[in-house]
């Protein structure tokens, strides 16, 4: 019942499966296999969340990951269909760098970072991943970078200045 209610509350979310991994636990009688799934969901207009689910079967792991992603959504201040300013993010051994791009550039990003940017609603961006390319760490680093991005309006409000003073 909870699954049906969650889908009815947010029917317009884009969902992407990034990775499925088989893991094993060694016990006295042999190995027990289970699966992990990494997913991202977003509304294409600045809301994004990621989830990591574990279960004995692949569909159950994906479903758990999607539910966690819907619960852990953040808002991102976008500038049209690109970023406000260049941002860096870091998680564990992964570092990501993203900067806004002009109209028509597209999403220049690889793997896990591309999926996060697509569901967020970013259409023009240049990005690079340094260090570890582990999908979980890259997704966390990308989301932390997007979370730390501020619009000129929010910076002006915090500092008590006008927007043209912030932009120079």
Curated annotation (Swiss-Prot):
A GO molecular-function annotation: structural constituent of ribosome
Record flagged with keyword Ribosomal protein: yes
Domain S5 DRBM: 13-76
Listed GO CC annotations: small ribosomal subunit
Superkingdom classification of source: Bacteria
Gene Ontology biological-process annotations: translation
InterPro entries in the record: Ribosomal_Su5_D2-typ_SF, Ribosomal_uS5, Ribosomal_uS5_bac-type, Ribosomal_uS5_C, Ribosomal_uS5_N, Ribosomal_uS5_N_CS, Ribsml_uS5_D2-typ_fold_subgr
Entry keywords, A to Z: Ribonucleoprotein, Ribosomal protein, RNA-binding, rRNA-binding
Statement: the UniProt record of this protein carries the keyword Ribonucleoprotein: yes
Record-linked Pfam families: Ribosomal_S5, Ribosomal_S5_C
Notes on the domains: The N-terminal domain interacts with the head of the 30S subunit; the C-terminal domain interacts with the body and contacts protein S4. The interaction surface between S4 and S5 is involved in control of translational fidelity.
Quaternary assembly: Part of the 30S ribosomal subunit. Contacts proteins S4 and S8.
Function noted in UniProt: With S4 and S12 plays an important role in translational accuracy.
Family named by the database record: Belongs to the universal ribosomal protein uS5 family.
HAMAP family from the UniProt entry: Ribosomal_uS5_B (MF_01307_B)
Protein name as annotated: Small ribosomal subunit protein uS5
Organism: Pseudoalteromonas translucida (strain TAC 125)
């Amino acid at each position: 019942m909870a699954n049906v209610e969650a889908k009815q509350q947010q029917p317009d979310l884009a969902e992407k499966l990034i990775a499925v991994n088989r893991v094993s636990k060694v016990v006295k009688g042999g190995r027990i296999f289970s699966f992990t799934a990494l997913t991202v969901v977003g509304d294409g207009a600045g809301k994004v969340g990621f989830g990591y689910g574990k279960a004995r079967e692949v569909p159950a792991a994906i479903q758990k990951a999607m539910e966690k992603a819907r619960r852990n959504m953040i808002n991102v201040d976008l500038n049209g269909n690109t970023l406000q300013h260049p941002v860096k993010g870091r998680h564990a051994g992964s570092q990501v760098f993203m900067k806004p791009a002009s109209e028509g550039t597209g999403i220049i990003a690889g793997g896990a970072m591309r999926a996060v940017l697509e569901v967020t609603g970013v259409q023009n961006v240049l990005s690079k991943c340094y260090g570890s390319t582990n999908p979980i760490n890259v997704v966390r680093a990308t989301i932390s970078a997007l979370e730390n991005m501020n619009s000129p309006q929010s910076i002006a409000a915090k500092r008590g200045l006008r927007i043209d003073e912030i932009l120079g």
